[in-house]
Amino acid sequence: MKQTIGLLFIFLLWGNFCRAEIRIMPLGDSITEGGYEKRPGFPTTEGSYRTSLVPRLLSLNSKLSFVGSREAGPTALAQKRHEGHSGWRVDELIAGRVYARSYERGIRSWLPTYNPDIILLMIGTNDILQNYFIDQAPLRFQKLIDEIQRLTPRATILIASAIPTNNDHLNAEIEKYNSEIHSFVLSQRSQGASIYWVDMYNEAKMSWRKGDFSDGVHPSALGYLKMADVWFNHVAPFVSASLLRASLRE
């Protein structure tokens, strides 16, 4: 009898495993959104790093689903959903953004709606570009992570450092910001939080002088390929583990 119950449990678990869909949410600003290559004759950046990352991850696991309220990417990109919002700062991801005649909600709307298993987060560049109380940006980032964890306590959060620009002064501020949020991630990890550091700034080795940027802030197609490589190296190990966790959740 016990053996029969055990086999039945394994059968049900395997059935859920086979049906499980893993939801991945790219979350951030215009660098996540893509499409800011305006130079004539240069390859499009519509779809950002997702254009290269999505098919590579799908080749590992066909049950992945990229989610978000927005959709952008080239025709060949099978899954175009994301939460990349041009010009948005850290605090706006939490509270939303007020426009002249409208209001767009933030993660308090998106996360409950799409319930992602994995979140690919890169945010903070606009806080520095807009010189918006830069010293308080790491604290705002901590509040953002607290809110993400409250809204999606089972999600795995991969946090990418902000990438460089073509301005040395801005890069110094970006490096300081990255260092502080890295320390925060390490602190969270020591407490058992499911958040992980992706050192995009150093691992992608992007440079204006190498043709990795289209306008000094937004990556070129070449820059996005480098970003996709880094994301893939960090996300791939979580795909199968997240698949099993999702099957147990159903």
Task: Report each predicted region and the residues it spans.
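Active-site-proximal beta-strand/loop segments in catalytic clefts of secreted hydrolases
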Residues: 27-31, 67-72, 121-126, 160-165, ...
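Sec-exported extracytoplasmic/periplasmic mature domains
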Residues: 32, 36, 54, 58-59, ...
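Catalytic His-Asp segment of secreted/periplasmic serine-dependent ester chemistry enzymes
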Residues: 81-86, 163-245
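Boundary at the C-terminal end of the N-terminal hydrophobic targeting segment
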Residues: 18-20
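Conserved SGNH/GDSL esterase-like catalytic core that processes O-acyl groups on lipids
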Residues: 34-139, 170-179
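Sec-dependent N-terminal signal peptides
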Residues: 4-14
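Conserved beta-strand elements of the Class I
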Residues: 23-25
